[in-house]
């Protein structure tokens, strides 16, 4: 039942890197975990991080380093670094610790599942046909060089009385193959009829070595 599991968690440590890089003892682990969740929830709500695909949290000797993976680094940095400085101050107040921010630019946003899912959600919220949004996104992903893509939407589609799910698939998306580099993400579109859920799977190809996780974004700036 490979389709029932999360492709990211299934491949973490094999072809995917951990998104929290720290060690905590029995007393610290729960505190650190909750702090990571709060940091990610806080950043997700910031307008400057709307184009962010993910956040990697590292801890070292009382300091926290957060890497923001985004397709729009200029929006996060702000004019003369004003926005990133504000984020650092707000995170310092939230955690009570010194926080470093690093901005990693995503060179090919069409191949990032989170950015694709968020884009479909925004279109559905603007009352674009969900089928048109899905097919357009799939075409962009395949044109960018993906091996395969699958997109599923669920909810009261087009205002239907009964909720249902629809999905489209193009190419190969093997969920059981560990060496297959599958990117997966979800998003929600808030409509007048209720919440529409979006799931995106993108097959980026197979890794020749399944023991070396790939790097989804390269650091471009630090603050």
UniProtKB/Swiss-Prot annotation:
- Write the record's keywords in alphabetical order, separated by commas: Ribonucleoprotein, Ribosomal protein, RNA-binding, rRNA-binding
Indicate what this protein is called per its UniProt record.
Answer: Small ribosomal subunit protein uS3
Q: Which Pfam families match?
A: KH_2 (PF07650), Ribosomal_S3_C (PF00189)
Query: What biological process terms from GO does the record include?
Result: translation
Q: Does the keyword Ribonucleoprotein apply?
A: yes
* Single GO MF annotation: structural constituent of ribosome
The species this protein belongs to is: Chlamydia pneumoniae (Chlamydophila pneumoniae)
Q: Does the keyword Cell division apply?
A: no
